[in-house]
């Protein structure tokens, strides 16, 4: 999954160890959170898209943790309080 994450982020296959470790940590934390939302069940392979999408969201927010929005020179960014909010219907459907 790390290779897919690098590709989606536009990173080369070979990256420095610190960045690779950061990506692995993001993937691990995202998978753990999804496992919690699934009531302790291991996320099935069909939910890998959720892990990847949320990992991208979390990677792009590095340095802005705790903020709900950010504006600089006319550019405004905002983040959901729950990175999984857009996937809750899929998660509920899986649990049903």
Where are each of the predicted segments found?
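Conserved short "hinge" loops at termini or chain/domain junctions
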Residues: 1-47, 83-96
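Short loop/turn elements at secondary-structure junctions
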Residues: 47-48, 52-96
């Amino acid at each position: 999954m790390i290779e897919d994450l690098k590709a989606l982020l536009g990173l080369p296959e070979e990256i420095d160890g610190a960045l690779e470790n950061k990506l692995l940590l993001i993937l691990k934390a995202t998978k753990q959170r999804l496992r919690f939302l699934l009531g302790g069940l291991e996320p099935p392979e069909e939910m890998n898209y959720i892990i990847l999408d949320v990992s991208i969201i979390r990677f792009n927010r590095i340095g802005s943790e705790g903020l709900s929005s950010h504006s600089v020179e006319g550019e405004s960014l905002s983040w959901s309080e729950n990175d999984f909010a857009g996937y809750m219907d899929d998660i509920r459907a899986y649990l049903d």
